[in-house]
Amino acid sequence: MSNKVHLGHTARKRFGQNFLTDGNIINRIVGAISPDDDHVMVEIGPGLAALTEPVAMGIKNLTVIELDRDLAERLKVHPTLKDKLTIHQGDAMKFDFSQLVEPERKLKVFGNLPYNISTPLMFHLFEFAEHIENMHFMLQKEVVLRLSASPGTKAYGKLTVMAQYYCQVVPVLEVPPGCFTPPPKVDSAVVRLVPYAEKPWPCHDVEMLRKVCNTAFNMRRKTLRNNLKPLLQDADFDVLGIDAGLRPEDISVAQYVAMANYLCEKR
């Protein structure tokens, strides 16, 4: 039997499907998620229910969002899960997560995300950060390193800045390829993202912050002076107290927010 087949389902490359099969890793992830009925529990991409079953066992209801129509149909007739699941068959990238919020109950979101859409999907979820208590995601290890990076390191980039603007980022555990069917070609890791109730560095306009990050990191080896020339001059850097001779990876999240706010005030 092909190593792409698990529980009678063939993994689909176009959906980026790799099914988690290691029981010890599954238990550790469920422990980190800490399912409860005080929050609306939401799983993105339940697949063949490796996380769905143990999470649903201890709670009254679990909402799942599954793009693959065949897998959504399997869940609808699952002998132990069908009465516990609220199933949305569709694209999580287009899903309005605010519709799931209930009075006094924020969302806890988790999933083994398809690696080919993990970054844009996280950016989509950041738009609903005020409604989310925390998120636990299986991602490429490289992406988790970028999310949790510190200034001055090679992994630090625009994804780091935007993620850490919205959330506390905590790596949870590493997961080798052999824990999946089929095994991915890269190492994986689980990360916890906890949206700030009050952002430590409030930004006037998140789109401006995104623009500053995109422009600054466009050419990593060049200085801020070169990369941000369309937006900021030396006199502006002097006002901000930022050394224009530094490279983009040397600048903190707070400093990126300060640049974005300064540009908003200059408009």
UniProtKB/Swiss-Prot annotation:
GO cellular component: cytosol
Pfam families: RrnaAD (PF00398)
Subcellular location as annotated: Cytoplasm
EC number(s) stated in the UniProt entry for this protein: 2.1.1.182
Gene Ontology terms, MF aspect: 16S rRNA (adenine(1518)-N(6)/adenine(1519)-N(6))-dimethyltransferase activity; RNA binding
Membrane-spanning ranges: none
Reaction it catalyzes: adenosine(1518)/adenosine(1519) in 16S rRNA + 4 S-adenosyl-L-methionine = N(6)-dimethyladenosine(1518)/N(6)-dimethyladenosine(1519) in 16S rRNA + 4 S-adenosyl-L-homocysteine + 4 H(+)
InterPro entries per record: KsgA/Erm, rRNA_Ade_diMease-like_C, rRNA_Ade_Mease_Trfase_CS, rRNA_Ade_methylase_Trfase_N, rRNA_adenine_dimethylase, SAM-dependent_MTases_sf
Keywords: Cytoplasm, Methyltransferase, RNA-binding, rRNA processing, S-adenosyl-L-methionine, Transferase
Coiled-coil region list: none
Annotated binding of S-adenosyl-L-methionine, by residue: 18, 20, 45, 66, 91, 112
Major subcellular location class: cytoplasm
Similarity field: Belongs to the class I-like SAM-binding methyltransferase superfamily. rRNA adenine N(6)-methyltransferase family. RsmA subfamily.
Function field: Specifically dimethylates two adjacent adenosines (A1518 and A1519) in the loop of a conserved hairpin near the 3'-end of 16S rRNA in the 30S particle. May play a critical role in biogenesis of 30S subunits.
Protein name: Ribosomal RNA small subunit methyltransferase A
